[in-house]
């Protein structure tokens, strides 16, 4: 099950420390109450059957808070999406995350999640203005050494409402290419079968070069040998097989269909994804729980869950 929260870790230790330094009592009490609510939620999740598994999204700062990570493990929150975005100081500045770690410090921080029983789906962006050909290999190396369970490597795409989109649209002006009567600056209005892949322009690399190098990183990370090594975090052979199939499915769904521009390759990837999804569904089917009780808050009574 996915805990639908764009940041499951709402109060960082740094936030608490800042409120204390500022002697902001009201803010400190507010943060502590919010933090306590999240711990209470995890205590209640921990009362559910052990085959109920949860996933969520979290910020890198959570690695500093091992008490929170341990509570996640007890709550059976097996994994979290973490937006790493970039592995170089220049790349982090491009995405306004200059406060994040790079190099060995980044590897250590990401490993902290795994060491406390929380698998990480790391998200990386390629095509940032500061990216160079060496960035791709450096990113693949970090993803390998950081002990990530899964990773996604996306190409920088200008989406409406973002600073990148506004700059891209302004740079094209009235010269934007058109598909039919629709400019590519409104690419979401173009029929799916005619819609081009739209990526932010790069100062030194072409879209084709970025696409090819991005695909190579996907191929590297999701090679069968590397997937099998990563699957050792699972407790049983059934779980290892499920991990391998899920990894291959993830790659087919997001790399081959999301990056490829050749329609034949996309169709091939879709067929493979459907084939892999069938055994995945069987392996991930849980036993029925007709008498499942919703965990009670402290001092309360449990409530029977509705089917």
Segments predicted by a language model, with ranges:
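Membrane-proximal basic amphipathic "stem/tether" segments
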Residues: 12-29, 225-307
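Glycine-rich Rossmann NAD(P)(H)-binding loop
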Residues: 4-10
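A structural motif corresponding to the C-terminal lobe/cap of the Radical SAM core domain
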Residues: 19-238, 295-298, 302-307
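Generic enzyme active-site microenvironment
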Residues: 3-4, 83
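Catalytic P-loop NTPase motifs of RecA-like helicase/translocase cores
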Residues: 10-11, 90
């Amino acid at each position: 099950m996915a805990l639908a929260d764009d940041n499951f870790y709402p109060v960082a230790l740094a936030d608490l420390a800042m409120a204390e330094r500022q002697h902001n009592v009201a803010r400190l009490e507010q943060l502590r109450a919010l933090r306590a609510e999240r711990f209470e939620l995890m205590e209640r999740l921990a009362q559910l059957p052990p085959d109920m598994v949860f996933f969520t999204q979290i910020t890198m700062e959570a690695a500093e808070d091992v008490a929170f990570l341990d509570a996640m493990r007890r709550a059976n929150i097996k994994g979290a999406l973490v937006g790493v975005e970039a592995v170089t100081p220049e790349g982090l500045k491009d995405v306004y995350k200059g406060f994040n770690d790079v190099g060995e410090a980044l590897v250590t921080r990401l490993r902290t999640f795994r060491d406390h029983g929380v698998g990480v789906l790391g998200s990386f962006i390629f095509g940032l203005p500061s990216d160079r050909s060496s960035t791709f290999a450096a990113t693949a190396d970090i993803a390998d050494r950081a002990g990530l369970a899964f990773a996604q490597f996306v190409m920088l795409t200008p989406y409406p409402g973002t600073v990148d989109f506004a700059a891209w649209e302004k740079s094209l002006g009235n010269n934007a290419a058109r598909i039919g009567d629709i400019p590519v600056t409104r690419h979401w209005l173009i029929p799916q079968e005619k819609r081009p892949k739209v990526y932010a322009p790069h100062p030194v690399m072409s879209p084709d070069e970025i696409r090819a190098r991005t695909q190579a990183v996907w191929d590297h990370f999701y090679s069968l040998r590397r997937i099998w090594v990563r699957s050792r975090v699972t407790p049983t052979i059934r779980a290892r097989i499920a991990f391998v199939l899920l990894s291959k499915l993830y790659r087919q769904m997001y790399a081959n269909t999301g990056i490829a521009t050749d329609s034949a390759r996309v169709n091939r990837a879709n067929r493979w994804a459907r084939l892999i999804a069938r055994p995945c569904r069987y392996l991930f089917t849980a036993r029925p729980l007709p008498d499942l009780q919703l965990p009670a808050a402290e001092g309360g009574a449990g409530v029977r869950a509705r089917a």
